[in-house]
Amino acid sequence: MKRIYNFILLVCLVQLAVAQNRIAEIRENLLGNYSDRVLVVSHRADWRNAPENSLQGIRNCIDMGVDMVEIDLKKTKDGHLVVMHDKTINRTMTGKGNAEDYTLAELKAMRLKNGAGCKTRHQIPTLEEVMLLCKGKIMVNIDKGYDYFQEAYAVLEKTGTIDHCVIKAGLPYERVKAENGDVLDKVIFMPIVNLHKEGAEKIINDYQSHMKPAAYELVFKDDNEEMLRLIRKVRDSGAKLFINSLWPELCGGHDDDRAVELHQPDESWGWILNQGAKLIQTHRPALLLEYLRKKKLHD
């Protein structure tokens, strides 16, 4: 009996060490300076094979070897943070209205829909449930969730996952600092910069002067010389580039569907890699991982 107990304890310790190493490895690739590895970020989890932003979709991403899963937050009537992208629950759940119109128990009584709009057995997850599932396995990118920055931070603190999370916002440094300065340096914060908007370069300069973020999410509908100049500016600053391949208007036309439907991965993901991107957010995580592995840019 003692041998069995010791064996079980050893297995648990090994699993814990592997989990800790997994997150440490992803963080090193995100925050360090010397890795060739490119991180794969799956947008709204594995929504092609499970309901978007669902625990099952996140499990699928973990099993694939995805590095980071993107989620969005809303708050329930009774103050719980849940994972939901849209303003309403109409498209993705069996109910109607806004998440804040319902208590968590009421939302849990509903079911998530799949990509075809059919009811599934899956429930809307809370942020706490997501972080506990992801703990030691995959990092989390909170995209539409800045309005709940402080509350999200409290959940990360409670679950021991502050080091697992990236929080983003498309806002200038001064506002982010004024609203969340007390916790800003305790998390990985990533600015989102639309390179076409007036003042984009000033936003970059201000962040570089005051914060020096580990990475920037850059959005650009064209790949003209001015966009490429700003991309180089961020890359040459030492920050990592986070580029979306979700649809053409986010990446100058070098999107997932170009890679998959037009069979032009080198003109899509390859082009993004050539700009120096170290994080690619995708709707095709399995295929992007396959592409990167062939280039020895991912395990």
Task: Give the residues covered by each predicted segment.
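Bacterial Sec-dependent N-terminal signal peptides
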Residues: 1-23
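Phosphate-group recognition and catalysis centered on beta-loop-alpha active-site segments
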Residues: 19-299
